[in-house]
């Protein structure tokens, strides 16, 4: 009724008003409800849409029903698939192996934004990590642009822009490498605090770090390390990163060399480092980071004071926690001793670059958008796998790739689409050889991310929307919805 009030008011003021209605109708809730009532998801969804349409029309709301869009209909998701192909051609849709969030109850992966306090946003079930080959959109390629363009939104609430800033999470720091003589290898770390590099007393690896496999070769501690990694991988991200969670780890028996000091540093596998942020390895500086302090306390690892308050000495025996203040002076830091910490940051990065073991780097908390779902009720991903040609896009004139109806919804972790022989088996559009289709579907947010554009040109069967028509109506003046 709020939207209807605004639309009627603007019409009476002489504005051309676009006030449409549509149905974001793919996704797990509809699929689960259909399964529960033993009815096909399409039938269940369209019957509910018809009922809600009847109710809205009975209320007399001033929607332009001629512009109605329904994301689960073929005339809409054809264009969602078309967008996927456009992104693929431009190198922005990629398939890669990744540790993903997995919900055993929903039998599907979840994007980071769909995990709330370590639980599935739909069913509240605990989420675990699982290695799968998945499709991603490379939104990280646009991280700087997304951040910079927040300044072009002067009317947006500050709390929303702050959320976006934190979600993108831009930071500047140093990436540098520690040699591992026993393995003839190196391990790289990323830090925003290069001024603490002289205080490194251990190396903390994420349980998913690929170096662990090499560390475990002919290592008497391999069973202990692998068991620990398996346990940690099943912990939620919230559980692992919470400041209140117990910091745990296993010493690997292997050492690396701090390039700044030449000192041997123990390599540990820990539960508080995440592989998908930075490099998946963190330099442990107990006196400069509270998590490292707690970890060093638990395992009796050496602590070295490298930063003191200006004009004041910090004695290790008198410290009860890490010194994390933003002002200070370096001590026990070689040629940088006595330097103010912010000046030292730049000077230490200069040294790493000059000596060839490190480089300045910009890092982001933002991750690529995981769009694969092992569910039925979503837009099929228009990819064919050929033994000769590899990944092949479904030709544009063959879109949409339609959802099959002869599927099983009790396939466990297997996508329901994989149970349809007729859907899976096809011919390669390039060479004509026997091939198979991608059986994952797209995240429902893919369909709902562009419907506002389709409203402007809802009956166009030649393209998703006409640019000139969209420019006439856009951008959206008022949107009523959640903070996301």
Where are the language model's segments positioned?
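Residue patterns forming the tRNA-binding/recognition surfaces of aminoacyl-tRNA synthetases
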Residues: 36-187, 194, 281-400, 409, ...
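N-terminal cofactor/phosphate-binding cores enriched in small/glycine residues
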Residues: 1-44, 50-54
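Structured ligand/cofactor/substrate-binding pocket environments in proteins
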Residues: 1-7, 24, 71-81, 95-96, ...
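A short acidic-Thr-Gly-centered motif at the start of a beta-strand
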Residues: 175-183, 257-259, 275, 431-434
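Pocket-edge structural micro-motifs
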Residues: 21, 139, 178-180, 191, ...
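Conserved active-site neighborhood of enzyme catalytic/cofactor-binding cores
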Residues: 1-6, 11-18, 119-121, 254, ...
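A short small-residue
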Residues: 28-34, 61-64, 473-476
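A general alpha-helix detector
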Residues: 29-33, 145, 211
């Amino acid at each position: 009724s709020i939207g209807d009030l605004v639309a009627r008011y603007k019409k009476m003021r002489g504005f051309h008003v676009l006030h449409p209605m549509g149905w974001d109708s793919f996704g797990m809730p509809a699929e689960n409800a259909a399964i529960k009532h033993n009815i096909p998801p399409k039938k269940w969804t369209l019957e509910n849409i018809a009922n809600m349409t009847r109710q809205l029309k009975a209320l007399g709301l001033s929607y332009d029903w001629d512009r109605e869009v329904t994301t689960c209909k073929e005339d809409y998701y054809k264009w969602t698939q078309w967008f996927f192909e456009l992104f693929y051609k431009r190198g922005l849709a990629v398939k890669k192996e990744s540790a993903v969030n997995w919900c055993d109850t929903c039998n599907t992966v979840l994007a980071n934004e769909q995990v709330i306090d370590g639980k599935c946003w739909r069913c509240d079930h605990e989420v675990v990590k699982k290695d799968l080959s998945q499709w991603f959109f490379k939104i990280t390629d646009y991280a700087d642009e997304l951040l910079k363009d927040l300044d072009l939104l002067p009317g947006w609430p500050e709390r929303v822009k702050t959320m976006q800033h934190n979600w993108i999470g831009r930071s500047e720091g140093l990436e540098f490498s520690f040699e591992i003589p026993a393995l003839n290898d190196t391990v790289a770390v990323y830090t925003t605090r290069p001024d603490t590099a002289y205080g490194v007393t251990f190396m903390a690896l994420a349980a998913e770090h690929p170096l662990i496999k090499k560390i475990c070769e002919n290592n008497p501690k391999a069973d202990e390390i692998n068991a620990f990694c398996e346990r940690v991988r099943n912990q939620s991200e919230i559980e692992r990163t919470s400041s209140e969670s117990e910091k745990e780890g296993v010493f690997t028996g292997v050492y690396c060399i701090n390039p700044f000091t030449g000192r041997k540093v123990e390599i540990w596998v820990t539960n508080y480092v995440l592989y998908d942020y930075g490099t998946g390895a963190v330099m442990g500086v107990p006196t400069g980071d509270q998590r490292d302090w707690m970890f060093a306390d638990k395992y009796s690892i050496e602590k070295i004071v490298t930063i003191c308050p200006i004009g004041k000495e910090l004695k290790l025996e008198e410290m009860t926690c890490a010194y994390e203040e933003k002002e200070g002076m370096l001590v026990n830091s070689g040629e940088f001793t006595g330097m103010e910490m912010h000046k030292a940051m730049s000077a230490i990065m200069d040294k790493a670059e000059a000596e060839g073991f490190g480089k300045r780097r910009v890092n982001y908390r933002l991750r690529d958008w995981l769009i694969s779902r092992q569910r039925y009720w979503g837009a099929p991903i228009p990819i064919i796998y050929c033994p000769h040609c590899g990944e092949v896009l479904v030709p544009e004139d063959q879109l949409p790739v339609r959802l099959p109806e002869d599927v099983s919804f009790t396939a466990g972790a297997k996508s329901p689409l994989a149970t349809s022989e007729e859907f899976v088996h096809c011919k390669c559009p390039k060479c004509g050889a026997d091939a198979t289709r991608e059986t994952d579907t797209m995240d429902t947010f893919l369909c709902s991310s562009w419907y506002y554009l389709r409203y402007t040109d809802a009956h166009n069967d030649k393209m998703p929307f006409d640019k000139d028509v969209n420019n006439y109506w856009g951008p959206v003046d008022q949107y009523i919805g959640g903070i996301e």
